[in-house]
Amino acid sequence: ACIITLNEADRIDACLDSLAFCDEIVVVDSGSSDGTRERAMAKGARVLEHAFEGYRAQKDFVVNAAQHDWVLCLDADERVTPALRASIERERDGGFGHHAGYRCARLTEYFGAPLHHGNAYPDRVLRLFDRRRGGWRGNREIHEHASVDGAVAMLAGDLDHQAYRSLPDQLARLDRDPRLLAETPHA
């Protein structure tokens, strides 16, 4: 599994606990000052430090640091549910078939309430893929997405997404995200 972090000490334990079935967990941290790196190491993750150059670049870096060809990429505010874990393990045990990647339904929780309606669910995200056939591509610096060359299947089970810590956290993102979008070059 591959995770990028910056000051995620309050969330990293639950994320890593949900990945206990993975053969390897790599965390790339971009300068946390809250004990994130230490918590991740205590959970058995291999932790690397890398200066932040953008979300996509950071995710490419962690994928390239993995030792296995198949990688599961999560953000620190995400958790693999038991149903998703079972689905991933079934595919892994079957050799992943002819697929290059797998999507899962991400279920966002908004201050503890799951968003099952509207455009929020299912947010089908490609998070498990063969890194030889894909990665974090495109020119988007926020809401970046992985893509692969080859067939993509859908996994059963949800990826739990604990989007915001608090209302001030959400407001800070509403300030940050448009600036990042404005700085993203467009083709």
Please place each PLM-identified region on the residue numbering.
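Catalytic-site signature of metal-activated, phosphate-bearing donor transferases
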Residues: 60-63, 69-70, 81-187
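Acidic helix N-cap motif at the loop->helix transition within catalytic regions
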Residues: 10-13, 34-43, 83-84
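A conserved acidic beta->alpha catalytic loop
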Residues: 18, 29-39, 75
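Short acidic donor-binding/metal-coordinating loop in glycosyltransferase active sites
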Residues: 30, 50-52, 68, 75-78, ...
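Short, well-formed alpha-helical segments that are part of the catalytic scaffolds
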Residues: 3-21
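Conserved donor nucleotide-binding strand/loop of the catalytic core
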Residues: 37-65
